[in-house]
Amino acid sequence: MKISKMQVHNIRSILDCTINMADYSVLIGQNNVGKSNILAALRLFYDKIKFNDAEDFPKIQTTDNESWVEITFSTTESEQALLKEEYKTADGFLKLRRIFKTDNKDFPIKASNSNIFAYEHGVLSNRNFYGAKNVSLGKIGDLIYIPAVNKIEDI
């Protein structure tokens, strides 16, 4: 699976952002424009860091009380074959949303769940993707994050 698109909603300084990805993607920009927050959103999706409402929800006015990251994966035929029927698509994409905060009672957010929800037949399902937290995270691969090194001693 490859990430083809990432959408971020109400994470740190990002209210709404869509990034189309390629095989290799680069984030370029001036200081303090949100590059690190894009990476933080990706790390939040993969459960590498935990969502903290006080730190991760925007400090500025938002249009709603939701916080989520949505990733669209392009899959191969063999990867599609391994998916449950409800997650398979004709175009070979798998679209998942990890919800960190919401007032919508249709999406039960629990610490014991992955809180990753899949699109089924083009509609966001309110059932957790593959149910158990460890199973759902195992289905989407892993993220390797290499932090910046400021001192030679840190290498």
Q: Which residue stretches match the model-derived regions?
A:
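Conserved long hydrophobic alpha-helices within structured protein cores
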Residues: 40, 64-74
